[in-house]
Amino acid sequence: MSTPNRYTLPKLERLTSRILIEKLFTGGSKSLPAFPLRIVYMPIEGEHLPAVSLLISVPKKRFKRAVKRNRVKRQIREAYRKHKDCLHESLEASGKKVVIAFLWLDNELHPSAEVEEKVQKLIRLTAEKLA
C-alpha cells in the first residue's frame, strides 16, 4: 500500500554542509539554465544523506533588499516542494543521491506561476539526465 505524497521540505533535505557546497561549485557538477534560474547538480555517495539535498541562492548583487531576496527564495522553495516527486521517483528507481542548487540569474522579480513553471522544467530535465 503506497503512502500519500507529502508536499513538505524538511530540514533534512536542505543542503547545509560547507564541504558538499564547495564540492558542488568547484568541480564535478553539471548545470542547466532556464531563465531566470539555473540548476547546478552533482550525484553524491553516502548512506546517511537524503536522496536530494537542496540549496537556494539569490545573490545580494541581484537584489539589494532582503525582502525581495526572501520572496524569490520562497517562490523557488514552494515550486520545488510541489514538484519534487518527479525527481524523487527517478532517484529511487536508479538508487542515486544528488545535491542540487537553484541559482537566481535575473535582476527583476517574476510572478510565482512563471517561477514554478521554470522550476518544474529544471526538475524534469535533471531527473531525465540522472535516470
Please report, for each region that a protein language model flagged, where it lies by residue:
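Positively charged, solvent-exposed patches that mediate nucleic-acid binding
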Residues: 1-131
